[in-house]
């Protein structure tokens, strides 16, 4: 099993990533040199632990946002996604096909007056697997 990382290592790595994200990489040796240049770390062992955790977090950041780390690039990307407005509205189509349940939901949301709604029967026969032991 691996070792438990102390809060000192985790906090230092998070701060380093937030401030020096552009200089860091997925390579431990590169991150070790960057940590050595930018921070005063008292021991070689602690520096290596911090660099290792920085490398670990950088790999996680590549896959998606990481809790506790706010990077300007990720913040801008999130803003762009939140402010996205489609060029053509989904309601501006000539015919919108909905099933009866969706039609009822639209009525409850005061969208029942849309003229281009066409109620269609849902297709039966979806082959969903049932859990073992279910009747």
UniProtKB/Swiss-Prot annotation:
GO terms for biological process: ribosomal small subunit biogenesis; translation. The keyword Phosphoprotein applies. It is found in: Cytoplasm; Nucleus, Nucleolus. The modification N6-succinyllysine is found at residue 19. It comes from the Eukaryota. GO terms for cellular component: cytosolic ribosome; nucleolus; small-subunit processome. Keywords: Cytoplasm, Isopeptide bond, Nucleus, Phosphoprotein, Ribonucleoprotein, Ribosomal protein, Ubl conjugation. InterPro entries: Ribosomal_eS17 (IPR001210), Ribosomal_eS17_CS (IPR018273), Ribosomal_eS17_sf (IPR036401). The keyword Cytoplasm applies. Pfam families: Ribosomal_S17e. There is a cross-link at residue 103 (Glycyl lysine isopeptide (Lys-Gly) (interchain with G-Cter in SUMO2)). Component of the small ribosomal subunit. Part of the small subunit (SSU) processome, composed of more than 70 proteins and the RNA chaperone small nucleolar RNA (snoRNA) U3. Component of the small ribosomal subunit. The ribosome is a large ribonucleoprotein complex responsible for the synthesis of proteins in the cell. Part of the small subunit (SSU) processome, first precursor of the small eukaryotic ribosomal subunit. During the assembly of the SSU processome in the nucleolus, many ribosome biogenesis factors, an RNA chaperone and ribosomal proteins associate with the nascent pre-rRNA and work in concert to generate RNA folding, modifications, rearrangements and cleavage as well as targeted degradation of pre-ribosomal RNA by the RNA exosome. Belongs to the eukaryotic ribosomal protein eS17 family. PANTHER family: 40S RIBOSOMAL PROTEIN S17, SMALL RIBOSOMAL SUBUNIT PROTEIN ES17. This is Small ribosomal subunit protein eS17. The lineage of its organism: Eukaryota, Metazoa, Chordata, Craniata, Vertebrata. The gene is RPS17.
């Amino acid at each position: 099993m691996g070792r438990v990382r102390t809060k000192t290592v985790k906090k230092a790595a998070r701060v380093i990533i937030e401030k020096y994200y552009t200089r860091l990489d997925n390579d431990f040796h590169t991150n070790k040199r960057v940590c050595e240049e930018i921070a005063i770390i008292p021991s070689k062992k602690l520096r290596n632990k911090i660099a290792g955790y920085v490398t670990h977090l950088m790999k996680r950041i590549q896959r998606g946002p990481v809790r506790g780390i706010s990077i300007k690039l990720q913040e801008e990307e999130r803003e762009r996604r939140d402010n996205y407005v489609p060029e053509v509205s989904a309601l501006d189509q000539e015919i919108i096909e909905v099933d009866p349940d969706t039609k009822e939901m639209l009525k409850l949301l005061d969208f029942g007056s849309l003229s281009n709604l066409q109620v269609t029967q849902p297709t039966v026969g979806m082959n969903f697997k049932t859990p073992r032991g279910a009747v």
